[in-house]
Amino acid sequence: KIKNTMPERYWRFVPSIRNCQLAELVFRDAEGRVLTGRLIGPDVVRGEKLFDNDPLTYTYIDQWIGIDFGVPQAVSEIFYLPRNDANGIFPGDRYELFYYRFPEGWISAGKQTASDHWLRNKTTGIEERIFTWEKGEARFW
């Protein structure tokens, strides 16, 4: 969320490091509508992937990339997604929740909408990490 919603024609994303890998960049107004415009800046050649609504594509930003809305727009929210391997949780994807019971092993609790437990993405992604709960904290192996 953005506190200052003064209408501006141009917005610029400047990474704090060179070679920033970004998958998505979305600007929204106060009603949640996606604001679109023309890409500007030295990294514009690679920028189209930022707006393709695909979390698996990404671009490298070395200097900065900006957007020209054509007319001043009041931006209320900016959503960005770093490069990822799709092992996260995405709306519309199916997940399967597991728990471990000794000596049987891992048991499926069923396919369901994601919550905040270990979930296996059944649509994309193959990496998984096993953890144990020790002294009130998750220990990843």
Enumerate the language-model features and the residues they cover.
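Aromatic, loop-rich ligand-recognition surfaces of beta-strand-rich domains
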Residues: 1-117, 121-141
